[in-house]
């Protein structure tokens, strides 16, 4: 089983986050998110947040609105569009998991599977990386939480003996832009 996690952006206290099925540990997905921040300005990250529309991962392609379908032609190009009609959004966007850079390469794709509640289940969500555009920080989360954190914005509800993931590190985006450090160096005690 892969190391599952969550990644995405937050603005105006609203998450646009998606599930990542494997390699979510800091040295993989974490470093990818860190590198994404290094290569993008705060304005570019705000633009991405603003253009992303969240969809339910179980929603069928045939159920998409015209607005949601707009720009997805590139995703159909490798397959017969008629064969994909009954596919769900999770399957269609599988190759976008954990890679915000793909939204740059495929600029017309503007949908993301909505996984905002996954971070609340730290038994299964092992790591999380959220670019918080309200505070201009990268927030790094860790799963397997056996104790609640009263200040956790995702609550204190227990699920199978586990609480929501907790923030283990906040790193200013300006510091990331102005430093040669890697995420591993910021998280030295967590590796």
Residue spans of the language-model regions?
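Short, extreme N-terminal segment that most often corresponds to the first beta-strand
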Residues: 1-32
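N-terminal interaction modules that seed assembly of large macromolecular complexes
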Residues: 26-47
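Low-complexity intrinsically disordered segments
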Residues: 41-191
């Amino acid at each position: 089983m892969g190391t599952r996690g969550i990644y995405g952006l937050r603005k105006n206290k609203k998450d646009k986050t998606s599930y990542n099925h494997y390699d979510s540990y800091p040295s993989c997905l974490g470093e990818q998110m860190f590198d994404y921040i290094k290569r993008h300005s705060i304005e570019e990250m705000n633009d991405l947040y603003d253009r992303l529309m969240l969809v339910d991962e179980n929603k069928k392609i045939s159920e998409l609105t015209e607005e949601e379908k707009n720009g997805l032609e590139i995703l159909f190009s490798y397959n017969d569009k008629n064969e994909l009609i009954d596919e769900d959004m999770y399957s269609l966007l599988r190759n976008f998991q954990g890679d915000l850079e793909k939204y740059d390469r495929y600029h017309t794709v503007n949908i993301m599977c909505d996984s905002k509640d996954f971070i609340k289940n730290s038994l299964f969500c092992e790591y999380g990386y959220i670019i918080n555009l309200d505070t201009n920080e990268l927030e790094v989360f860790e799963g397997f939480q056996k104790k609640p954190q009263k200040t956790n914005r995702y609550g204190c509800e227990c699920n199978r003996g586990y609480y929501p993931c907790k923030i283990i590190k906040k790193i200013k985006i300006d510091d990331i832009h102005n430093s040669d450090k890697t995420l591993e160096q910021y998280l030295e005690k967590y590796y």
